[in-house]
């Protein structure tokens, strides 16, 4: 089984906060102010050290320390802004939900939580730090989902159009790994600023065409969302990638460099890093039902979980039926009246904890109570089926592809807006001050 993305991210993120060995450390200082929050110099230094260590392990070259520092600061700024937003709306990942996530990760890794803790600590990492980094990762995922999802509308006409296109042309059976560099422009730029950005973009393009390493160039020059990852986006089908990418790469081949392409954000350079056939043309769908209880000032976390445990006993003993309890108690208005039925769907459309739980169940099996950002659930997996993503392309699949494309686009818009509205001040290190 592939390593869990949660585990990989958390192990990577934990390394950021690991102190170097016993050399004396200078007194820490405030490096960045972000609204009423701060970033410490030690946080920047530790993240730079981690990026360098990962680059050495991957035999990857990096740009200058100053360019790398700029990208690290930008990543920390965006992270802090999202966490501040989560705090403002009262989004907090409690210990019970965190424990559930850790149990799911351990299950994916085919080990117990104790074994996973031992593995993490054997690599010199603190399990407590792992928990807090994972809590932050879950928070970021949830605040993005909450804030971005409500900005997205997928119209019936868009779905019908994509279904028709797929039926006429067939599902594009190629996935592309895209490299992206954005040379940004200021808000409301004048002609001189546009010209300056255009010249920078063309200079970057010439360096790339002369053989300069793309990842190193992206870290040094890009203002795009994946800059610190060398500008590399994961494999995407053309129907789910951002519109800007999809419009220019159709028919392109591995190694092609395209651009600069002008948009409202600036000038884009795109490279086809790799292209491959779709890994599978079949998708797995599940039919499930659930009961949701939402903790509140009246219903505590422990009480909600205990009620679901009691429901579970009643269902297993035959004293009550799942659908009857769902109609009576579930607080999911979309499914309660249908006995908790969620219908056929890909597990990936649900929040991660729900999807992970469904993936761990056998048909007819009912889960133990588990926590998501929506509240406490029990769910029953009723059936699984595989459908052909090319021959049986349906409206649900079309909606998912359009939604993913729009989510990537709106996520960046949301981050840009938050950054533009924030008070941000970067304080230069003493050694850089004139």
Swiss-Prot record:
Residue ranges of domain PpiC in the record: 173-274, 283-383
UniProt xrefs under PROSITE patterns: PPIC_PPIASE_1 (PS01096), PPIC_PPIASE_2 (PS50198)
Location(s) in or outside the cell: Periplasm
Record's signal peptide: 1-22
One Gene Ontology MF term: peptidyl-prolyl cis-trans isomerase activity
Keywords: Chaperone, Isomerase, Periplasm, Repeat, Rotamase, Signal
Record flagged with keyword Isomerase: yes
InterPro entries given in the database record: OMP_Chaperone_SurA, PPIase_dom_sf, PPIase_PpiC, PPIase_PpiC_CS, PPIase_SurA, SurA_N, Trigger_fact/SurA_dom_sf
Enzyme class: isomerase
Catalytic function, reaction form: [protein]-peptidylproline (omega=180) = [protein]-peptidylproline (omega=0)
GO cellular component, one term: outer membrane-bounded periplasmic space
Entry EC no(s): 5.2.1.8
Keyword field contains Repressor: no
Gene Ontology terms describing biological process: Gram-negative-bacterium-type cell outer membrane assembly; protein folding; protein stabilization
Pfam families per the UniProt record, alphabetical: Rotamase (PF00639), SurA_N (PF09312)
PANTHER family in the record: CHAPERONE SURA
UniProt-listed NCBIfam families: PRK10770.1
Domain notes: The PPIase activity resides only in the second parvulin domain. The N-terminal region and the C-terminal tail are necessary and sufficient for the chaperone activity of SurA. The PPIase activity is dispensable for SurA to function as a chaperone. The N-terminal region and the C-terminal tail are also required for porin recognition.
Main function: Chaperone involved in the correct folding and assembly of outer membrane proteins. Recognizes specific patterns of aromatic residues and the orientation of their side chains, which are found more frequently in integral outer membrane proteins. May act in both early periplasmic and late outer membrane-associated steps of protein maturation.
Record's protein name: Chaperone SurA
């Amino acid at each position: 089984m592939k390593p869990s993305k949660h585990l990989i991210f958390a192990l990577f993120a934990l390394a950021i906060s690991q102190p170097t060995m016993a050399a004396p450390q200078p007194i820490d200082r405030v490096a960045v102010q972000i609204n009423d929050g701060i970033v410490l110099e030690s946080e920047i230094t530790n993240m730079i050290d981690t990026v360098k260590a990962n680059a050495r392990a991957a035999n990857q070259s990096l740009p200058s320390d100053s360019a790398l520092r700029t990208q690290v600061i930008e990543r920390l700024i965006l992270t802090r802004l999202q966490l501040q937003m989560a705090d403002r709306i009262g989004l907090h990942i409690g210990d019970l939900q965190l424990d559930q996530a850790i149990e799911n990760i351990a299950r994916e890794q085919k080990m117990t939580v104790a074994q996973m803790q031992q593995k993490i600590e054997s690599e010199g990492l603190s399990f407590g730090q792992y928990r807090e980094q994972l809590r932050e990762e879950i928070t970021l995922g949830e605040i993005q989902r909450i804030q971005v999802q409500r900005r997205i509308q997928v119209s019936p006409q868009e779905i019908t159009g994509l279904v028709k296109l797929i039926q006429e042309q067939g599902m594009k059976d190629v996935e592309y790994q895209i490299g992206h560099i954005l040379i940004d422009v200021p808000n409301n730029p004048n002609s001189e600023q546009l010209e300056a950005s255009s010249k920078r973009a063309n200079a970057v393009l010439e360096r790339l065409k002369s053989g300069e390493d793309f990842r190193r160039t992206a870290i040094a020059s890009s203002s795009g969302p994946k800059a610190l990852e060398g500008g590399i986006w994961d494999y995407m089908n053309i129907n789910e990638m951002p519109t800007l990418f999809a419009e220019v790469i159709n028919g392109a081949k591995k190694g092609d460099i395209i651009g600069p392409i002008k948009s409202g954000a600036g000038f884009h350079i795109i490279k086809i890093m790799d292209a491959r056939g779709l890994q599978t043309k079949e998708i797995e769908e599940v039919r499930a039902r659930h009961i949701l209880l939402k903790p509140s000032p009246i219903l505590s976390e422990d009480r909600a979980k205990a009620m679901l445990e009691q429901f579970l006993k009643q269902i297993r003993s035959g004293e009550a039926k799942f659908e009857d309890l769902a109609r009576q108690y579930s607080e999911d208005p979309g499914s309660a009246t249908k006995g908790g039925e969620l219908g056929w769907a890909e597990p990936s459309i649900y929040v991660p904890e729900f999807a992970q739980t469904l993936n761990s169940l056998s048909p007819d099996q009912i889960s133990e109570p588990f926590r998501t950002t929506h509240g406490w659930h029990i769910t029953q997996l009723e059936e699984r089926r595989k459908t052909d993503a090319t021959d049986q392309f349906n409206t649900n699949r079309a909606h998912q592809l359009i939604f993913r494309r729009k989510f990537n686009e709106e996520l960046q818009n949301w981050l840009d807006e938050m950054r533009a509205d924030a008070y941000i001040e970067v304080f230069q290190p003493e050694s850089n001050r004139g």
